[in-house]
């Protein structure tokens, strides 16, 4: 730890650690996205054995995305609650909070339908 990190109040340290965890999750999510793209390409090339890995990577991607967005939302709420008390006044734009949940659910349903349709086509072939 740097000297400046040691001098930070405990609340700030906790927030920084939490944001570092969100950052790690987002990096993990990018790795999963890379694996999704690779395995999807393999499935498209006819490598049906890669389909379970594709499904696992997609599931892990969305799970990590859900977890990271939840933690980030919590940090935004904590920031909003503590503005003026522990932190200098700032403007937190709340317009977009919660809108992505509906889109995420819609994408999950689309993916399930895609995989279900693809499974049916594979089993009838």
From Swiss-Prot:
Signal peptide per UniProt: none
GO molecular function, one term: transcription coregulator activity
Any one cellular-component term (Gene Ontology): mediator complex
Alphabetized UniProt keyword annotations: Activator, Nucleus, Transcription, Transcription regulation
Disulphide bond pairs: none
Source species, domain of life: Eukaryota
Record-linked InterPro entries: Mediator_Med11
BP term (GO), one: regulation of transcription by RNA polymerase II
Location(s), subcellular: Nucleus
Protein family (similarity comment): Belongs to the Mediator complex subunit 11 family.
Function, in words: Component of the Mediator complex, a coactivator involved in the regulated transcription of nearly all RNA polymerase II-dependent genes. Mediator functions as a bridge to convey information from gene-specific regulatory proteins to the basal RNA polymerase II transcription machinery. Mediator is recruited to promoters by direct interactions with regulatory proteins and serves as a scaffold for the assembly of a functional pre-initiation complex with RNA polymerase II and the general transcription factors.
Assembly notes: Component of the Mediator complex.
Protein name: Mediator of RNA polymerase II transcription subunit 11
Lineage summary: Eukaryota, Fungi, Dikarya, Ascomycota, Saccharomycotina
């Amino acid at each position: 730890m740097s000297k400046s990190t040691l001098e930070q109040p405990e609340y700030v340290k906790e927030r920084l650690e939490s944001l570092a965890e969100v950052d790690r999750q987002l990096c993990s999510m990018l790795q999963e996205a890379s694996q999704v793209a690779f395995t999807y390409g393999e499935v498209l090339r006819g490598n049906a054995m890669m389909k379970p890995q594709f499904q696992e990577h997609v599931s892990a991607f969305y799970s990590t995305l859900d977890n990271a967005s939840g933690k980030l939302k919590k940090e935004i709420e904590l920031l909003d609650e503590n503005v003026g008390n522990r932190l200098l006044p700032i403007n937190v734009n709340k317009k977009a909070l919660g809108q992505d949940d509906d889109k995420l659910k819609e994408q999950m349903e689309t993916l399930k339908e895609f995989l279900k349709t693809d499974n049916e086509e594979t089993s009838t072939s």
